[in-house]
């Protein structure tokens, strides 16, 4: 069978036949296509085939600026001398010619082809449905001839696979390009550029946009562009940014994920608690859980609240120490205290002034006011009350100079003897008796070994180190984990972790009596981070979510006892691990990363 075939000819989408137009003859068509091809292959950069050597560039740059300076100088002289501008000398004429030549060269150097692409884009880059239909018709003519009676197969479906642009390799020392996220589109892109350029302050995005999540997304992209560092691993979705506005965090760009584990059940005062612990330290939750198991098997622990009062200590100054002492006697007078309490209590329906403790340093007086704060941690509440008292005392002592509403005699977020001795927040003691059988089977150690280790480590060792409130094994580990999980202030872990752990053999040396005394646990169940969804869920797990309307302050006090009970469990387990020599092995198993941490940041 004589089947004629013809080779496929290149087709250019810029040539499409109209409905009433006849196809060109073969030789004319080939000629037309060759002309179209030549037209398409013309590069805009060929318009100015000027050499671009370094010496030539330097010559034309120098000529351009020199001639411009000369012509501007002559122009100023003509204006000053009232000489017509069209009257030019031979040197000025040469300067004008040199200027034109340098401008032409510089246009070619900086890419005249870039400008021409906008002119020729409509002809060379256009692609519509007519072009595609024309190509399909041309391809369909490459099959068997229909006049020979051959069945014409359906043209195969043309699938155009998108070609991914080649990814440039980036050296470890190169600065990566800022990531372009979904926030970088449309109006958001303009806002991002304005923030990067300093036209819009980053802190004002929430108020300007009215959308906290959108503001966080834009701020995150801005940080990536400014620093050149990727924030891909910092999550943005799945968080209510309106809930932290004006309360928890300013200028957010995302949130950090911390795993939460459960230790328990902790049998405390006859009730069982499942304790949430947010931590990245392996073995911590497992160790605390073992301590809870030992306490549960021995009948549970007992916790007693000793004191409950938040403090704030302003600093005031007088002209003489005598005047400072007079104010000290005034505020410590029981009769005057009633008046001060009435003024203080006006700040809140939960705030109740309990006592005032004063200290003098020369002519400076520090007044440590202590008050109950209900279910709130109470720093804002007590500060408002202190301000009311200062305003009242200012009328009684006009020469009193208020240095600051906080004089560090409080003492907040710092290890201080005044907190260790007088207490701050909730002062709690928690105890349990662990039977000999549990010590051996669950804790894998001996009672005598635990008592000796506690004396030499937690008591003598801490004294040798000059510890202040640190007569324990790792109370801050448990306090921090529970604080983060329940929305407390992590910085107040400093004084809240003040703890002395005591161990003693009882019942003829067979059983172990263990106790922890913590004088300054600062917690609350309302306000701050407690209203966030995750932290609120953890508080709900403990049964202390929100304020207790029937007995104000009872939820916060119960949370403090749970913290102390958890510390008791953690102390018991860690001391047992050290006593039996299990500490290193357990940490090598549960607290050692296997990932490669040598990779450079991107």
Swiss-Prot record:
Catalytic activity: (R)-mevalonate + 2 NADP(+) + CoA = (3S)-3-hydroxy-3-methylglutaryl-CoA + 2 NADPH + 2 H(+)
Subcellular location, record wording: Endoplasmic reticulum membrane
EC numbers, comma separated: 1.1.1.34
Record's keyword annotation contains NADP: yes
One of the record's GO molecular function terms: hydroxymethylglutaryl-CoA reductase (NADPH) activity
Region (Linker): 116-187
Function: Catalyzes the synthesis of mevalonate. The specific precursor of all isoprenoid compounds present in plants.
Name of this protein: 3-hydroxy-3-methylglutaryl-coenzyme A reductase 2
Principal subcellular localization: endoplasmic reticulum
